[in-house]
């Protein structure tokens, strides 16, 4: 049965659930590093403004995506850019479209805010469906 999540901006009350979600989603190997990344980005003033979205089902946070600001100045002209990382969905809710809904909602909001370019750190077979291309191939 597919879930019908509610996608919204994260609020302070969601903050405790986000590291727990990341650990559940990424496991004990990658989870601690992802939790550290989230913590670092949330307090890094150079990464502001952030777009932090959650997916909730029955009031429970089951998904989270974080977009942080990236500063680019090719040829001296600043380009509005963001970094998508990390994206986490609780294992019980994976493969139901929640991650895709979070990414799509985030990209739509960033586009509306005038962001020109979005980079992603993540699974190379997952993100092309959203229009992402590999920066290099090895």
Which role does the model predict for each range below?
Residues 1-5:
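Basic/polar N-terminal segments that are highly enriched at the extreme N-terminus
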Residues 70-83, 94:
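A conserved beta-turn-beta hairpin within the catalytic core of GNAT-like acetyltransferases
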Residues 84, 89, 95-108, 120:
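Conserved acetyl-CoA-binding loop-helix of GNAT-fold acetyltransferases
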């Amino acid at each position: 049965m597919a879930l019908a999540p509610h996608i919204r901006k994260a609020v302070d009350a969601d903050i405790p659930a986000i590291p727990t979600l990341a650990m559940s989603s990424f496991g004990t190997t990658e989870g601690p590093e992802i939790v550290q990344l989230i913590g670092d980005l949330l307090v890094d003033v150079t990464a502001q403004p952030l777009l932090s979205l959650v997916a909730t089902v029955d009031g429970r946070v089951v998904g989270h995506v974080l977009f942080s600001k990236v500063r680019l100045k090719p040829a001296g002209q600043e380009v509005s850019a963001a970094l998508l990382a990390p994206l986490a969905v609780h294992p019980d809710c994976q493969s139901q479209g929640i991650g895709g809904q979070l990414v799509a909602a985030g990209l739509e909001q960033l586009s509306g805010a005038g962001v020109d370019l979005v980079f992603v750190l993540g699974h190379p077979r997952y993100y092309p469906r959203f229009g992402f291309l590999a920066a290099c191939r090895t």
